[in-house]
Curated annotation (Swiss-Prot):
It is found in: Nucleus. SMART domains: AAA (SM00382). May form heterododecamers with hel-1/rvb1. Component of the SWR1 chromatin remodeling complex, the INO80 chromatin remodeling complex, and of the R2TP complex. ATP binds at residues 76-83. It comes from Neurospora crassa (strain ATCC 24698 / 74-OR23-1A / CBS 708.71 / DSM 1257 / FGSC 987). Belongs to the RuvB family. One of its GO terms (biological process) is box C/D snoRNP assembly. This is RuvB-like helicase 2.
Amino acid sequence: MAAQVVTVGESKDLRGLNLIAAHSHIRGLGVDADTLEPRVASQGLVGQEKARKAAAVVLEMIKQGKIAGRAVLIAGPPSTGKTALAMGMAQSLGTDVPFTTLAASEIYSLEMSKTEALTQAFRKSIGVRIKEESEIMEGEVVEIQIDRSVTGHAKQGKLTIKTTDMEAIYDMGSKMIDAMTKERVMAGDIISIDKSSGKITKLGRSYARSRDYDAMGVDTKFLQCPDGELQKRKEVVHTVTLHEIDVINSRTQGFLALFSGDTGEIRSEIRDQINTKVAEWKEEGKAEIVPGVLFIDEVHMLDIECFSYINRALESDLAPIVIMASNRGHSKIRGTDYKSPHGLPLDFLDRISIINTHSYTPDELRQILTIRAQEEEVDLTPDALALLTKIGAEAGLRYASNLITTSQLICAKRKAKQVGVEDVQRSFKLFYDPARSVKFVQESEKRLIGSDGVVDFRVNGGATGEPAATAAGGDSMDTSS
């Protein structure tokens, strides 16, 4: 009996205005939804099965709301997919759970203190899901009557609206008439009116009026006439972050700062009042706290004061999940003379869970480069892909990935349809990888300005090869022919 073939379908969403970035091909963690077992290559991620499964377990706990105030460190050598793993988690969480990405060097600013920048990042990563009930009227417009006064008084009108079960007539004031005119509401339209705010939403047009016109616009949407009562109670859910509430309450017309980005320092008293109010909403059942994710890339760039602040912030009631990435080994903690694993203090390492990533195999490199070529819409020959895989194994995945675009430009110059080996070879000769660049620096050491300011301006280093001019002694120059 033949084994059953299981296929996994993946839809590729339209990118829109987003440019092709280093991780734009990642659309999730690529794990099975039920067993959390990672697939070999799925949703843009390849290999790193153990790390992806560990990330999937953390992700499942985040979705269930069972984990908050925890820290996870993704540690591994460069070009092993640490940031890609975090991006996969962000894509899997969706838009409802706040996900904030922060590079460790971003917190150093002259306009804002380090702790304020970290506080804002923490507050951006905590969502508040606010529930409110609104009374709406939804139905098909039968007739609109507008009476304009000759003497210039306010306009008055009547709106006849119906469902399949009932019909009613409402009096309209001048503001409602203006709103109807602005939305271009006419007989046959299906509309929704929020009674508390007076907002009118045009949902579509009734099927009964589909023959009124011979030609319709592409945005015309035909709907069935609503049934039941005209007036209904509807629960509306808004998800905002604590940082957005902070900004709005920090100054007059604070909501404008949300768009300009000029938030500045926010006083701790305002944050305390907001925390108290959110706690009241939570007790009354009006709001729900959504712990999000704060991702700090290159976390070893933080100094000892920042780690001390994060230690305290993780113990507070309103704390997100902090995911960090580091490619350092046993290195010095910034701001101290002490060395520690991953460049993090030992008391901070004691609080975190660590996920390790390993170097990719040649087969995994080939699959990643294939995905990148598809994302950048580059057609590679099998030999060119094999050469790029070899380059990636020896010079690094990032360098090989960058060669895809440059090889495509060289290929387009000779008006070929497929990127061949000669295109990759020419691109390899034009652009140096780190190893060849280091070799060039070593060979040209005397021609380059060193840390002591010594440089040789003579062609080929002269006869003796010794420096002829120095930064300190400008008068010592060899003028012999």
